[in-house]
Swiss-Prot record:
[4Fe-4S] cluster binds at C127, C131, C134. CDD domains: Radical_SAM (cd01335). One of its GO terms (cellular component) is cytoplasm. The active site is at E107, C351. Its cofactor is [4Fe-4S] cluster. It comes from the Bacteria. One of its GO terms (molecular function) is tRNA (adenine(37)-C2)-methyltransferase activity. Binds 1 [4Fe-4S] cluster. The cluster is coordinated with 3 cysteines and an exchangeable S-adenosyl-L-methionine. This is Probable dual-specificity RNA methyltransferase RlmN. Belongs to the radical SAM superfamily. RlmN family. Keywords: 4Fe-4S, Antibiotic resistance, Cytoplasm, Disulfide bond, Iron, Iron-sulfur, Metal-binding, Methyltransferase, rRNA processing, S-adenosyl-L-methionine, Transferase, tRNA processing. It comes from Staphylococcus epidermidis (strain ATCC 35984 / DSM 28319 / BCRC 17069 / CCUG 31568 / BM 3577 / RP62A). S-adenosyl-L-methionine binds at G177, E178, S209, S232, L233, H234, N308. The gene is rlmN.
Length: 364
């Protein structure tokens, strides 16, 4: 729930007349009802309408009194996302470009796997981290999303899956933006979708990825929630990582590893390192050896990413043979590594690419 204190702390939050009803955690809904002279058991009914029956309006909540429905309408908005573009890949991946109520656009991706349907959500409109391989940073950061706007991405995809009796089984927070720069809203989102009264998506089926905002890694280590944790690494040495990710100049590799070790000491959970392979930059066997040396004492997994070509950036794809050699070298050195299956390569599946294309059209 967005309070005055939250708005003061997070200057990039929107200033809507009404906040999204999807921004309230279950405990916040209970307290809000009590504060407004209602019985807190109504929270269970409201969450059932929102997340199980997935209604589009408060008026459809027919087991609530007209008085309570009116109170809810007076205070909250039912966040809706308008689908501007929907691209479907031959492998079943679907990329959505959604328009928010203030006209900004965000991306959400549905990925189909043998083990279920995974949704990749966005946490910010744009991004200010400045990764040199990512289209998301091209327009800078416009604003943060409310928790309810992040929840609505999952719900909108789930409603589409309802037509074929499928469900969202996994969530990855790897879309546009840096989740740890919108930390409180991200954490509210996690607690909402993980709640038994909501979408009930298991914590171990949710992954959050950061570019390495070190203060928030320490905060995340203290959270009582077993969410999977991934770090975008892309380079084992400062020279290469700073070239790819300018954030490394503020939070270098040594400091990042120190924070990750603290996280593991506190949680005893495995960390995934995302390592995008960029032709001629970080994809040689010497780079694999540097990576293995850096993380050899950690409980971790390396996810090797054959990077989609992004026309807005100048990096090229690493040849398949070199990708396999890189993986083989890591395994030889005792590192658990896999190559991410390419999905959506025939659509604008690189992060921020579809949004960037639409922005070009708008400004012509």
């Amino acid at each position: 729930m967005i309070t005055a204190e939250k708005k003061k702390k997070n200057k990039f939050l929107p200033n809507f007349e009404k906040q999204s009803i999807y921004s309230l955690r279950y405990d916040e809904m209970q307290q809000w009802l009590i504060d407004h002279g209602q019985q807190k058991f109504r929270a269970k009914q409201i969450f059932e309408w929102l997340y199980q029956k997935r209604v589009n309006t408060i008026d459809e909540m027919t087991n609530l009194s007209k008085e309570l429905r009116q109170i809810l309408k007076d205070h909250f908005a039912m966040t809706t996302l308008t689908t501007v573009v929907k691209q479907e890949s031959k492998d079943g991946t679907i990329k959505f470009l959604f328009e928010l109520q203030d006209g900004y656009t965000i991306e959400t991706v549905l990925m189909r796997h043998e083990y279920g349907n995974s949704v990749c959500v966005t946490t910010q409109v744009g991004c200010r981290i400045g990764c040199t391989f990512c289209a998301s940073t091209l327009g800078g950061l416009k604003r943060n999303l409310e928790a309810g706007e992040i929840v609505s991405q999952v719900l909108t995809v789930q409603k589409a899956l309802d037509e074929t009796n499928e469900r969202v089984s996994q969530i990855v927070i790897m879309g546009i933006g840096e989740p740890f720069e919108n930390y409180d809203e991200m954490m509210d989102f996690l607690r909402i979708v993980n709640d038994d009264n909501s979408l009930n998506i298991g914590a171990r089926h949710i992954t959050v990825s950061t570019s390495g905002i070190i203060p928030r890694i320490y905060d995340f280590a203290e959270e009582d929630i077993q969410i999977n944790f991934a770090v975008s690494l892309h380079g084992a040495k400062d020279e290469i990582r700073s070239r790819l990710m300018p954030i490394n100049r503020a939070y270098n590799v040594d400091k990042l590893m120190e924070a990750i070790r603290y996280y593991q000491e506190k949680t005893n959970r495995r960390v995934t390192f995302e390592y995008g392979l960029f032709g001629g930059v970080n994809d040689q066997l010497e780079h694999a050896r540097d990576l293995a040396h850096l993380i050899k004492d950690l409980n971790c997994h390396v996810n090797l990413i054959p990077v989609n070509h992004v026309p807005e950036r100048n990096y090229v794809k690493t040849p398949k043979d070199d990708i396999f050699k890189f993986e083989k070298e890591l395994k030889r050195l005792g590192i658990n590594a896999t190559i991410r299956r390419e999905q959506g390569s025939d659509i604008d599946a690189a992060c921020g690419q579809l949004r960037a294309k639409e922005r070009q059209v708008e400004t012509r």
